Amino acid sequence: MSSRSKERVVTAFRKIFHKSSNNNNNNNNNHNNNINNNNNNDKVDGATGSSPNINNNNNNNNNNNNHDGAAAPSSAGGVAVAGGAVGSSGSSGAAKNAVVRMAAEQAVWDSPGKRRRQDHKVAPTTERQLVAAPDHTIRTRRLMKEYREMERLQAKNDAVFTVELVNDSLFEWHVRLHVIDPDSPLARDMAEMGVPAILLHLSFPDNFPFAPPFMRVVEPHIEKGYVMEGGAICMELLTPRGWASAYTVEAVIMQFAASVVKGQGRIARKPKSTKEFTRRQAEESFRSLVKTHEKYGWVTPALSDG
């Protein structure tokens, strides 16, 4: 073989080896680019949910830029298709992961515990809300107990007083006091004038028994005996200052019987007005006398005086 033939053979082998090394380098570059693109796609898809088509276009552009020569399109095309498949599968996996994360977050948001926490957020309190509302259940239970005891007492033939509800309301009572100290002027007046009993009206506030009932004389018109204008009754027991939740209605009535006798109460034979006592008059008179006695003190008669 001549030297020229040897040079041609060597040149041909160099070209073949040069093309092979270029193809290997291009394949390695394409593989690295695909890996980088897949990583970028996972980040982008997790944040923005981009489409796999964009990744395929990027892979194709990178492959086209990395190849040259006549043999490059065929080999590069194979790599590009493979890279596109890899990018597509990676992107779809990232999209699925993003969907799963969003679904998990939505599930947490829509969970019963989350909804309950959202529904039961505490509203800002106001000064009005800080004031405790009266418990009507306590008042009702206490009055039912008191009323049953009254019915038991008035079932006796010699009952000192009787009780009936006003308009079937448990919170308003009419009490008829039948028995007064027989040696008192008031008892003699009742016998002479044919008055069978002293009619009292009691109304119980919302916060009873922690506040006293309001009691007034309805009839007859009584002078002195700590009975004021409008039938108001001057008794410290009926004021918030003198009241205790342990007091019973029976004790209040018996205290009145003692007070009216101690105060020399008499039935008015010629009353100043023929009109009946009204609740409004009694309330106004009671407020006035409470102010007076808070300034000068109270005098409470003993129960034995009645």
From Swiss-Prot:
The ranges of region (Disordered) come to 18-77
| GO MF annotations, alphabetized | ATP binding; ubiquitin conjugating enzyme activity
Which regions are flagged for Low complexity bias? 22-41, 53-77
Listed EC numbers: 2.3.2.23
Q: Does ATP-binding appear among the keywords? A: yes
InterPro entries the record matches: UBQ-conjugat_E2_core (IPR000608), UBQ-conjugating_enzyme/RWD (IPR016135)
Among the GO biological process terms of this entry, one is: protein polyubiquitination
Q: Which UniProt keywords apply?
A: ATP-binding, Nucleotide-binding, Transferase, Ubl conjugation pathway
User: What reaction is this protein's catalytic activity?
Assistant: S-ubiquitinyl-[E1 ubiquitin-activating enzyme]-L-cysteine + [E2 ubiquitin-conjugating enzyme]-L-cysteine = [E1 ubiquitin-activating enzyme]-L-cysteine + S-ubiquitinyl-[E2 ubiquitin-conjugating enzyme]-L-cysteine
Give the pathway annotation.
Protein modification; protein ubiquitination
Q: What does this protein do?
A: Catalyzes the covalent attachment of ubiquitin to other proteins.
Family, per entry: Belongs to the ubiquitin-conjugating enzyme family.
Designated name of the protein = Ubiquitin-conjugating enzyme E2Q-like protein CG4502
